[in-house]
Amino acid sequence: MNAAEIMRSYIIDIETYSIAEQAGMFCESLKENQDGSLFKDTKFCYYEDEPYEVSFIWDRDELRIQLTFKGDPDDSTWLIINGKRRFRGQIKDIEKSCRTFLDTLKEMTVS
């Protein structure tokens, strides 16, 4: 199962509309743009504290990939940690945010 399919399986059960909408749009963008190898061999974890936030988390060794969607869309973020390197971005313009997220993930997993 790829990252977008995993997200989709959880989004269906999110009750807070604004969170489900954000996560759903990001999931669609991820589905269109992702390289499946970026999430290869990761362990998935889902966290929810509705109606405030939900997080999708993937871990592999020192790599942590996290998407957090909050009730207030201005507070939603993506986070990538690899060892001592840490990058975080806001999820505003879904398409642009997703591309930036994936580009950063590629850069951090290659180097």
Predicted regions and their residues:
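Active-site beta-strand termini and strand-to-loop segments that position acidic
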Residues: F56-R60
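Intrinsically disordered, low-complexity regulatory segments enriched in Ser/Thr/Pro
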Residues: E5-R8, E62-K96
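Negatively charged, low-complexity tracts enriched in Asp/Glu with abundant Ser/Thr
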Residues: M1-V54, R88-K92
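Membrane-insertive, pore-forming/entry segments and their flanking low-complexity regions
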Residues: R88-I91, T100, T109-S111
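Exposed alpha-helical structural elements
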Residues: Q22, S97-T100
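Charged interaction scaffolds used for protein-protein
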Residues: G36-L38, D61-L63, D75-W78, S97, ...
